[in-house]
Structure formats: C-alpha cells, structure tokens
Amino acid sequence: MSSLLGLGSLPSRESTGSVAMNILFFLTPKNEVAYIFEDESLRQALEKMEYHKYSAVPVINRRGKYVGTITEGDMLWGIKNKFNLSLKEAEQVTVAALDRRSDNRPVYADSNMEDLIDKALNQNFVPVVDDQKNFIGIITRKDVIRYFYNKSLEVQQPVANCQTAAIQ
C-alpha cells in the first residue's frame, strides 16, 4: 500500500516499537465525535445526524461499548419497512430496534497501520476501541489521506530541490 503512495514501507511493530502511537496519531477522541446511544430514539438520532450533517455515526451502549454504525439509509428503511412511522412515532423507537445494513468495522487502539488502512479504504471513518471494546473515538479516511498526501509532498520537495540544483 505505502509503496503505491511513494512513501516506502509503513512502520511496523518492529520498526516503531509502539504501533498504538501510529494509529492514535489520527484519532479524533470520543469527546469530539458525534455518536448515538443505542437506546436513544430514532427521532433523537435523526436530529443529531442532521445537526452534525453526518450520514453515518457510531452507535454505542451506555457502558461505552461500540455496537455498530447507523446510517441515514438504515433509518429511512427502518421507518418505511419495519415501523411505518411518522416523526412523532419515531420518538418511541430506539436505534437498537433498527436493522443496520453494515457496520463500520472497528480497529483496536494497538492495531497496526495496515489494518487501519485496510478498513479506511472502505469506510469513511474507522471506529477505535480499547481492549475491552470501549469506544474511544474515530479515525476518518480524510485524515489518513491528508497525512499521506502531505508526506508525499515532503518527499517530492527535496527531489525537486535536487533537480533544480543539478540544472544550475
């Protein structure tokens, strides 16, 4: 993967000594993330997603454990197919009662970069959990791409400077 980006190999457990530091560099902590409790009402979830302008958010239980990911589509299909609800009636339905088509697979805080990138390729955000599966935050695909893009510019800049110096 990293060779495709022109950055050499990604750090490994052996080369860095602390893999957790690698992926946690990208972490948006739980206190800065919009998430939904599984016992919140469908209406509360819709309003939270609308307020934050998100199309998908992590779902956790009251003990802080990551349960899955809920999307706008999950909610709309639930309203149409499972509950046939008005918005007022949606106050009585919890997020846990909705079927989720797919969940964003989490990584553990001590996962390696390859695992993070593998998941980020197919998910807009990657939930991060601790060894007890407590939700601790997310890593966005945007942050990972931005980091590697900036690194690629750093690699290209010295090469450009060398080429300019050789011409003079």
At which residue positions do the language-model features occur?
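Tandem CBS (Cystathionine beta-synthase) repeat/Bateman regulatory domains
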Residues: 1-168
